[in-house]
């Protein structure tokens, strides 16, 4: 089920207006297929698998949480995600969704923890890496953000949001070459992306 990603920086002034705007566009313009955010069948889990009924109940709670999140009922959604994770700690969908809610409340370390858990369960997916990178940017952990984004573009090279956010990370690291390359790739995928276009110009990118 695809749901809009919540706004991650309702008051994140420490990123500065330019960075906040870029990251907001990077995430708010996309929808994530959370229903497919589940571990591969052959992945071993460090925790004992819960009983079948617990897994089903956890998935039902996660689905309710998504519906509540779409309706703007953040507290109720968080309660459902907490319940889902208590029933099934390996529910990557609930972990990722809860991470987005924490991110929307600027609780970025909690978001990082949830995205890390979701990534451990679904290492083939780019979404938890992108989410964690955004929170790392808010925490001024720019190198960690760049590392996540490097991995994310390998997992989903057609995702313009990831390339735009990677451009921000490398721009903040002072690597204009990688920033320009990232912004340029975002523009190739989404030519009307004004954030990527202005970032590309800002770092002195040359049209190829």
Regions found by a protein language model. Name each.
Residues 31-34:
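Bacterial signal peptide processing site
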Residues 53-90, 100, 104-107:
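Alpha-helical segment of the N-proximal tetratricopeptide repeat
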Residues 58-59, 92-93, 126-127, 160-161, ...:
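Helix-start (N-cap) detector for alpha-helical repeat units in TPR-like alpha-solenoids
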Residues 62, 69, 96, 102-103, ...:
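Position-specific recognition of the canonical hydrophobic site in helix A of tetratricopeptide repeat
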Residues 71-83, 104-117, 139-151, 173-185:
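Structural signature of tandem alpha-helical TPR/SEL1-like repeats
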Residues 171-194, 201, 205:
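TPR/TPR-like (Sel1-like) alpha-helical repeat modules
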């Amino acid at each position: 089920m695809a749901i809009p990603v919540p706004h991650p920086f309702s008051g994140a002034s420490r990123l500065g207006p330019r960075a906040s705007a870029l990251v907001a566009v990077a995430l708010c313009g996309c929808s994530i297929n959370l229903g497919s955010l589940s571990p591969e069948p052959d992945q071993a889990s460090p925790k004992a698998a819960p009983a079948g009924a617990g897994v089903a109940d956890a998935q039902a709670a996660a689905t309710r949480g998504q519906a509540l999140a779409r309706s703007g009922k953040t507290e109720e959604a968080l309660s459902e995600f907490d319940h889902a994770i208590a029933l099934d700690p390996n529910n990557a969908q609930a972990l990722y969704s809860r991470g987005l809610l924490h991110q929307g409340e600027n609780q970025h370390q909690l978001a990082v923890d949830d995205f890390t858990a979701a990534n451990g369960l679904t290492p083939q997916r780019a979404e938890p890496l992108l989410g964690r990178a955004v929170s790392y940017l808010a925490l001024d952990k720019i190198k960690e953000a760049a590392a996540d984004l490097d991995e994310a573009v390998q997992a989903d090279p057609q995702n313009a949001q990831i390339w735009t956010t990677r451009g921000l990370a490398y721009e903040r690291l002072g690597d204009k070459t990688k920033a320009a390359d990232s912004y340029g790739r975002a523009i190739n995928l989404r030519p009307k992306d004004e954030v990527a276009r202005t970032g590309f110009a800002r770092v002195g990118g040359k049209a190829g």
